[in-house]
Amino acid sequence: MRIGYYPGCSLLGSAKEFNESVRAVCEAIDLTLEEVLDWNCCGASSAHALNHDLALALPARILAQAEAAGLEEVLAPCAACFNRLASTRAALEADLVKRQEIVELIELPYSGRVRVLNVLEVLERYRDRIEEKTVNAFRYKVACYYGCLLVRPPDVVKFDRPENPQSMDRLLQSIGAKPIDWACKTECCGASFSVTRTDLVAHLGGRIIADATRRNAAAIVVACPMCQSNLDMRRPEINRRLQQEYRIPVLFVTQALGLAMGIEAQRLGLQRHLVSVELPEPELEVVGDDDDEDD
């Protein structure tokens, strides 16, 4: 089975470990990733605020290149890339006049037939295979953190439940993990304010880190490079603000799956994390037991 692959800028830069772990897990489940040729930046996170046509043209060109390669679907692991590609596809489907303008701008044919999928959407298709290949049950309490861009706006991304998504929970349950019940699943981490308003990111991220820790999660699991960066890289600022020493690691979902499937930590990029990935001894109780706090 093959699927188009759009790594985007983050996965070749600040989130190399996401790219490495996506590729390692897909290889293990016999899913071939065909990288979109001559791809460009999708425009996240500033293009849509600065130039509307540019914000449409950049993702449209990526999808046009995928069409030219004969691809029917494209996996965009970065949540921001997924959101921009899905939003552009929806916008150009709804406005044929604007679609023609963008086609003339990118100088490539574009029909809108290529579907855009996020990493959770793709891996859910292979949940049974992932479960079959699990050799080290991931028996930890985990906080599944979806962030803003995977599930919103719901009429555009058309994925999961916007207020209480479950796809990552199901994936992690398939490898033996116990997702906690918490209210921060889709809270904002501060996103691109990481540079200009570090104080805001420390405030928002601190709430997420504190709640996951209070509920005894062994790790926070994400599917967004920006979320991972803000909760991992900005940990010193978060700890200073809250006068704590929070050490809970922040894993990409593909890293958690990869560990359970016996893939070496080096191949999953765990050494790249700033907050050391030190997991406790796996829990021995039945994963289905629920002793989380009520609020």
Which residues are covered by each model-predicted region?
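Iron-sulfur cluster-binding electron-transfer modules in prokaryotic oxidoreductases
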Residues: 1-295
